[in-house]
């Protein structure tokens, strides 16, 4: 079954208890960030440089209708990857497998005063949309959580009338292996690592007759990608320093993309731009791959 919600969440709205919960993506973590918007500098950076890429995509291609399916993958606050597209006037549809999370995301979009179509769908091997329904279908960093990522990629191609954009963590970068070998080994027992292989992703898309028109790297700040707050990373590395602990925690260390979207901290974009020199260096992307946090492909049906 699927549940479509096309308006902002009315007061008192609740998901029916009969709706079965779908896939779990570190439930305690995503539940926390439905109410705690302090994501950390790394995630604010990731979101805002992704927005820059999406802006370039909108300038180059005619994109009015957008599907993000599934909406999970990026850490931090769930369901806000497509907020910038909505702010640019796109008609956005989001798909999730978890009713509780989708309820929270609908409330978050209400805080932003943005409209969006919210779709609850447990079975991602067949999305509830007609062929050629969206100008852009995309997914960020969620494939390795899925029981059948290849089927989802096929569905993104089917429902797109033009573009398909897919990004995944870059397994060639230093932070990936720091996380995998040293600081977060247990996480990798919960995902299907085959789907960080960009060759596998491209092959799956090309089998659906999608033409790959661009590939590259995104999210290249001057720090490694460990997908955890700096204070937690120091703790797991056994580094105990009250000075560093104070520096990377407390009221003075607050980083919230929601604050940026709500107009509370407009200076965050300038801060991110100050760190994004590696994104802008005019070098081939293959030379940046050892440090870039994500790799992506863009395909076209035309």
Question: What are the roles of these predicted feature ranges?
Answer:
Residues 1-38:
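N-terminal, positively charged/glycine-rich alpha-helical extensions of SAM-dependent methyltransferases
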Residues 43-65, 80, 84:
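Conserved alpha-helix/loop element of class I SAM-dependent methyltransferases that forms part
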Residues 65-126:
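Class I SAM-dependent methyltransferase SAM/SAH-binding core
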Residues 135-147:
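A short SAM/SAH-binding and catalytic strip from SAM-dependent methyltransferases
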Residues 150-165:
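A short glycine-rich, Lys/Arg-flanked "PGG" loop and its adjoining helix->strand segment in the class I
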Residues 162-195:
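Conserved class I S-adenosyl-L-methionine
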Residues 192-215:
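Short alpha-helix
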Residues 211-263:
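Conserved catalytic loop of SAM-dependent methyltransferase domains
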